[in-house]
Amino acid sequence: MAKEKVIISRSGFTNELGWEIYFRPENNSEKLGDLILQEGSKMGMIITATPSFRGRRIEAGLLSAGQDFTNETNPFSVGLGRFVDLDKKNFIGREALVESDKRCKSWGVRVVDGVASKGETLKFNGKLIGRITSSTWSPFQVCGVGIVYLNNSDLGPGTIVEVECTDGKTHKGQLCTLPMYDPKGEIVRGTNKAIPSQPEPWGGIKKL
């Protein structure tokens, strides 16, 4: 690209049909940037930033290292157990994983008329049950969306919770599975290229 060697990947932090371009320190980033802007403008491309696509990351259940999972969690507790092969012998950490709790403690949450405050607590019937690890507003679902980590695995999708929000108030929310929609990953695979013409509000808002 622009006579520069880069890595172009179909992986992404948004679960959308797109591309990631990885630069090297020695790359001429200004030249590459100019080329991308020049060619992109022909297709209506606009410049945006992380906050604009954070919602899709959360809705897709793409966990952020150090935020949604840490060195204090294990793959099973954050819903990544499918990537662990305990039949494989002699790998680092295997014994700890064999003995670990295999139940999931990480779920999505939809919030009524508010955005959950990241790092704040999550309550059920007034009792502390976990914390918010990621959150933002979803213009597509027209509600706050987030990822939570619970203190135990007794509660799960469908549970009505109390969420501390950025407006300083407590709003009601509902735990849900991840991803929140497109469970088969048809969008990122390009098998569903339909672009919604309007939002699809979360129906649960009227029920809470």
Where do the model's predicted regions map?
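Conserved, structured C-terminal
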Residues: M1-L208
